[in-house]
């Protein structure tokens, strides 16, 4: 069986950055990890309608800085920054240190795997035909400059008795090329028939120079060895 490695995990440190960037000693590591998890859980639930793509957590000098990548920054910020201030206070309480929240706008949500997957799952919950939702997502991504996209849905599609998996692909999605910038994410649609899983891979092109290339010295030309003739 051809099982696939996680496209983001295998590219960490090559072309993909980490979502949490901090260092801690052995004593503090578990607490930091636990508060990271709780902060992500809270923000994901609180901003479920704000089209959040990524949450990046940093911990500079006894504080916590959260960068929210969203396609709808107005919803996160709220009137005169009221909503973001409420979020900051809760995050500070969870982490137990002063908190800072930054907002980063996602310019092209059609090229973000998480936002595309969430869009498809919300359409499935509204009883849109799964093939139509998949094709629309693929066409929008290709129109905005994606080199390739693959969308997969699995579950009781169309209310069928037997669960199945269907996928649709356009362009190239080279999963084995480590320098390929592949954005991968998943989402779930909670329908009356059960849960339908959605997976999205978006290939945006190759990142050259992600890591310093080491030039290999050319091997010196070696004299050819004469072959001995075997005895007859």
From Swiss-Prot:
Keyword Ribosomal protein tagged: yes
Domain KH type-2 span(s) in chain numbering: 39-107
Entry annotated with the keyword Nucleotide-binding: no
Gene Ontology terms describing biological process: translation
GO cellular component annotations of the record: cytosolic small ribosomal subunit
Record keywords: Ribonucleoprotein, Ribosomal protein, RNA-binding, rRNA-binding
Molecular function GO terms recorded: mRNA binding; rRNA binding; structural constituent of ribosome
Function: Binds the lower part of the 30S subunit head. Binds mRNA in the 70S ribosome, positioning it for translation.
Assembly: Part of the 30S ribosomal subunit. Forms a tight complex with proteins S10 and S14.
Family: Belongs to the universal ribosomal protein uS3 family.
Protein's recorded name: Small ribosomal subunit protein uS3
Species this protein is from: Sodalis glossinidius (strain morsitans)
Gene giving rise to this polypeptide: rpsC
């Amino acid at each position: 069986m051809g099982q696939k490695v996680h496209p983001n995990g295998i590219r960490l440190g090559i072309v993909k950055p980490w979502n949490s960037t901090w260092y801690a000693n052995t004593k503090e590591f578990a607490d930091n990890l636990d508060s990271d998890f709780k902060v992500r859980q809270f923000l994901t639930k609180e901003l479920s309608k704000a089209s959040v793509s990524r949450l990046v957590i940093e911990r500079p000098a006894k504080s916590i800085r959260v960068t929210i990548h969203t396609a709808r920054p107005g919803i996160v910020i709220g009137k005169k920054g009221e909503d973001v201030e409420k979020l900051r206070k809760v995050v500070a309480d969870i982490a137990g240190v002063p908190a800072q929240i930054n907002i980063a706008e996602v310019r092209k949500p059609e090229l973000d795997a998480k936002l595309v997957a969430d869009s498809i799952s919300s359409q499935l919950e509204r009883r849109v035909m799964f093939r139509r939702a998949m094709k629309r997502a693929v066409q929008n991504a290709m129109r905005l400059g994606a080199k390739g996209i693959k969308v997969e849905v699995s579950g009781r599609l169309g209310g069928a008795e037997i669960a199945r998996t269907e996928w649709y692909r356009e362009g190239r999605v080279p999963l084995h090329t480590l320098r390929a910038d592949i954005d991968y994410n998943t989402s779930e649609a909670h329908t009356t028939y059960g849960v339908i899983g959605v997976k999205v891979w978006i290939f945006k092109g190759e990142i050259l120079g992600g890591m310093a290339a080491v030039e290999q010295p050319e091997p010196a030309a070696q004299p050819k060895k004469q072959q001995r003739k075997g005895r007859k």
